[in-house]
C-alpha cells in the first residue's frame, strides 16, 4: 500500500490537525512566527496530538540563542551573509521584518518544550548560526 501525503498551508495556530492522523509532520520556517509561550506550547501540543504513536515531527527554522553574547555574534554573522547576498539595505529590511513579525526561540527552549508536551526522543540534526534542524518522536 502506498502512503498518502497531505499538505497544509495555513496559520498553524488555527489549523485543525486532528488526533493521531499523521506519521510525520515537517515544519519548515513555521514556528518562529509564534509569539507568546502559550502559543508555542499550544502548537507543539497540537502537533503531538496529531501524530500517531511512533510518529515524528521534524523542524527546520530560524532560532535564537539564550545568551546575549551568542545572539549578537550569530546575528552579526547572519547580517554579514544578508549584506553579501543583496547589500546593506536588504540586511536592514530582513532584520526589520524579523523584529516586527517573528519571535524565534532557542533550540534548547524548543527541545525542552517538545519533551514537556509528550515527545520522548528529541534529536538535534544540525545548527548553524541562526538556523537549526531538529525533531522528536512521539
What annotation goes with each model-predicted range?
Residues 29-33, 61:
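Short catalytic micro-motifs in class I SAM-dependent methyltransferases
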Residues 1-13:
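Conserved SAM-binding strand-loop segment of SAM-dependent methyltransferases
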Residues 26-27, 58:
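A conserved beta-strand element that flanks and buttresses the S-adenosyl-L-methionine
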Residues 111-138:
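Core SAM-dependent methyltransferase catalytic element
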Residues 41-53:
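A short glycine-rich, Lys/Arg-flanked "PGG" loop and its adjoining helix->strand segment in the class I
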Residues 25-26, 114:
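Hydrophobic beta-strand segment of the Class I
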Residues 60-117:
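C-terminal alpha-helical "lid/dimerization" subdomain adjacent to the S-adenosyl-L-methionine
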Residues 13-25:
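A short acidic, Gly/Pro-enriched loop at the edge of an enzyme's catalytic core
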